[in-house]
Amino acid sequence: IDAAIKPGNSGGPVIVDKQIVGVVMQANSGGRAENLGYFVPPSMIRHVLTDSKDGVHDGFPDLGFRTQTLDSPSAKIAYGLDEDQDGVLVIKVFDDAPAQGILQENDVILSIDEYDIAEDGSIQLSEDILTDYKHAIDLHHPDETVAITFSRNGIVSTTNLPSQRALDSYSLVKSEQFDKTPEYYIYGGILFVPLNMNLIKRWGNDWSRTAPVSLLQARNEWSSPDRRELVVALQVLASDVTLGYHDWRNWIVQYVNDEPVRDFAHFAEMVKNNPAENLVMENKNGYQLVLNHEEAVA
């Protein structure tokens, strides 16, 4: 909306022609636009109120796939679309997700429910409103079914996908969490933490530019049963045990004694139960951090 939103306005009503059309959410404070604000539309308000009726917060659903737009005419031809067909390309279907076994990578989703998807991933929500196609999924509640029409090698099919409660994140970098005690593990004077958005946002409001590139790039990697979470050697406390590594920080641990790290709990277990004289940690580029285990736990 084109309106000045000031601190304290959040949660107040947005009124147009004497009718409440939404709830004030936030202002754009990035400095690139003036008097630009955002509000929660009625459809989302109704969703939250309906969700709260049973006293259990289920949130919004997720079908367990990710897509990219199909703006390229060459890409449309490559995936079997006709000239009058548009949609989004499925690039990832996650394990144990509702879409697994039904959708496949390289399928093209043409519509969700009654909404046709444009090449840029938008849907015509109403006569004067264009929005992202994911909004059509957000209109549902977990455990409801979502009708999806898709094209596979030029053959069009329709299916009903059961929706599930959205997971914390399908990314290796978990989303920001609140009201939860931070996890950490100290070994040999090195502070290890799980990589999540709480950590990345330590670099301030401009974290997308100032946070270490390796941590930012990890946000584009998908989790899997064999690799659910990343572990970061955040800081090295200077000591004889860590001599040679005092300037190492924000270092992602990929392996411990040649075994891939599955998640933070798995990392802590491997370190604690290390049977060898030395413990060798390695990142994806092959750089190694070696500590004498007996000295590290002393």
Go through each PLM region and give its residues.
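C-terminal recognition in membrane/secretory proteostasis and scaffolding
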Residues: 13, 47-298
